[in-house]
Amino acid sequence: MRGKFITFEGIDGAGKSTHIDWVADRLRARADIAGVVTTREPGGTSLGEDLRQILLHRKMHLETEALLMFAARREHIAEVIAPALERGKWVISDRFTDATFAYQGGGRGLATERLEVLENWVQGSLQPDLTLLFDVPLETASARLAAARTPDKFEAESRAFFQRTRDEYLRRAAQSPHRFRVIDATRSIADIRDELEKILATI
């Protein structure tokens, strides 16, 4: 039986990464799951991690950025995601294609139609079974980022950029309610995990 594919999404500072290992551990405790693979984008493979460093720290044309994102994703799907799903394992990815539509599409203004062409070419019919969108107001995200490490290229973007990115995430969630669950990530970790527990019980 094919495994399930779960993605975590949200603007920088939303706090999604705090919960990935916890969700993975909850799923590993289930007897009906053959195994759980955690991964991330950009990255997830040796080549993908090299591209991640370029994407996070080098300035480039917005179309170049999108193409590199999808190049890393193609390798990620071929080497990690698809093989794991075929073996019946569940895959949890910290970001996937929704992030490209939100950041390069919403944030940078790249035409959705161009991204859809790349999406169809790179992943075909592959879509997450569940996308957890961790949503916070910009003020909350900014405060969390200010207290964190030195920002990368995306984390250092303007408030307007992050507002457009958040708006695109929420638009996509409204467009695909069967796949998305929007998490109010301003709440305590305990409250968020209570909600995640209920969501996981449905898949």
UniProtKB/Swiss-Prot annotation:
Alphabetized InterPro entries for the sequence: P-loop_NTPase, Thymidylate_kin-like_dom, Thymidylate_kinase
Catalytic activity entry: dTMP + ATP = dTDP + ADP
Pfam families: Thymidylate_kin
Disulfide feature: none
Enzymatic class: transferase
Keywords tagged on the record: ATP-binding, Kinase, Nucleotide biosynthesis, Nucleotide-binding, Transferase
GO BP: dTDP biosynthetic process; dTTP biosynthetic process; dUDP biosynthetic process
Superkingdom as given in the UniProt entry: Bacteria
Annotated binding of ATP, by residue: 10-17
Family label: Belongs to the thymidylate kinase family.
NCBIfam families xrefs: DTMP_kinase
Function: Phosphorylation of dTMP to form dTDP in both de novo and salvage pathways of dTTP synthesis.
Name listed for the protein in its UniProt record: Thymidylate kinase
Organism of origin: Cupriavidus taiwanensis (strain DSM 17343 / BCRC 17206 / CCUG 44338 / CIP 107171 / LMG 19424 / R1) (Ralstonia taiwanensis (strain LMG 19424))
